[in-house]
Every structure is written in structure tokens, then in C-alpha cells.
Amino acid sequence: MDSAAPVSEVRRNTYRLWIVTGLHAVGWALVYAEAQRTWGQSRGRFHVKNDWTGDGLSQNDEASHLFFGYTLTRTLSGQWRWGGMTPRRSRTIGAAESALALTLVEVMDAFNPAQGLGISDLLFDYTGVGAGLWTLSHPGDWTIRTSVKVAAHARVFAETERQSDNYIWWVTYRPQLRWGVKQPLSLGVGHSVRRAPDGITPVRELHFGIGTSLPDLVRTFAPQAARVLGILDFYYFNLNITATVR
């Protein structure tokens, strides 16, 4: 019986690794197809764009790249860990896969006549990957999250400035206080953009909020269920006040 248990565990982990590998392959294929449909075909000449000040989004796009680098790293690492990898290896593979995927997105943009390679986008991608990797190996009470202003306007692949402006990108901190890990509320500082009355000029916004995520809320009464819902920790349900930055 003692020898059968390790064999059974190895077989289970092998099956899980195949499941994760297959899901990732299908997922990245769908992302590629949707990106090409939304932002245009990558059939032009290689070129670089001024993405820091030239996209009319006042760095909200860079904030989104920070979020996706961070969230992808944590999510993919968790999936490889479920597949049976050691904590260290799952973190390494998750971070490498995230960095590679986000780099390939920028390479696609570099050959897209309507886009272009964004150097600042890449820098924020890699910063997000690094932040995600750091928090996996050094767990704490701060995280990077997102929320939307109007749910009806939400699009994962934003096609217009209006859709991009709908997102708020947050850095949140959850003080444990007297309740410890079951304390569900987080304080957040968020960044977003809206349009001036002319409908064109971007206006930067800072948001100061208090809120929670679904896993943090569920953890107050069902810690085991909260671990299962951990993949949903990226969304910040909040109340906030907004300050315009001129």
C-alpha cells in the first residue's frame, strides 16, 4: 500500500499537468484570435509607437499592463501548482509563461499597422510579472486589482477609448486589524481616465476607495471555499471618491 500511494499521486499529477497544458494552449489560441479580430491583423512592417503620451489614454493603458502582468503570473502559477509542480517551480513557470505571452502580444502589435510596439507597455508588463512573482514568494496584504465604472460598457479587449476609460486600476491594502485574515475590507488607490467635455482630451482621475474581493468576503465564513475562489481575487468591489488630476 505504501508504494501504491506515490504511484497514484504521480499519475494524478501527470493527468493534471496535461489538463493545465491543454487549457493553456486552447486559451492562448483564443486570446490570439480575439486580439487579431479586435485590434487588427499583424501583417504590416515592424514599427514602434509612442505609447506613453501618444495613445490619448494618460497612462491608463500602462496601468492595465501592470495589472495583467501581475494577475497572469499569480493565476498561471496557481494552475501549475495545482498540476503538481513544487511551489518554486510553479512560480517560475507561471512568471515565464506570463512574460512570454505578454511579449508576444507586443510583437503582434509591432507588425500591426494600427498599433506598434509599445516600449512602456513592455516595461509595465514585466514590472507586473515581477510584482506577481514577489507576492507569491513573499505573501502580504497588498495586491493589484481592477474594477469597472459601468458594467454594461465592460470589455476584456477594449476597442475604443470609452471602453478603456471604463476601467479603474487599483493598488489595495487589507489591514488585518483584530480579525486577522478574516478581515475582508481593503483600502485602495486607483487610477483611471475620463474624457473632457470635448469628448477627446483625456482627464486623469485618482480614486480612493474601500471595498473587498469575492474571496476576501467568502473567507470570513468559509475559508476553504475562499481558496477555491482565489482566481477571482482580481476584481475589487468598492465605494470610492474621485479626484481629478490636472
Per-range role (PLM):
Residues V148-V150, L187-V193:
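Transmembrane beta-barrel strands of outer-membrane/channel proteins
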Residues Q163-W169, P202-L206:
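Residues that define the transmembrane beta-barrel architecture of outer-membrane proteins
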Residues M1-E62, L66-P87, K182, T201-H207, ...:
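N-terminal targeting leaders of membrane proteins
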Residues I119-N166:
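Glycine- and acidic-residue-rich phosphate-binding/metal-coordinating active-site segment common to enzymes
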Residues L104-Y126:
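Interfacial helix-loop-helix junctions of multi-pass membrane proteins
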Residues T92, G140-I144, V181-L185, L206:
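Outer-envelope beta-barrel architecture signal
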Residues G130-W134, W169-L177, F208-L214, F237-A243:
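Residues on the lipid-exposed face of transmembrane beta-strands in outer-membrane beta-barrel proteins
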Residues M108-P113, H153-R155, R194-D198:
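Sequence/structural signature of outer-membrane beta-barrel proteins
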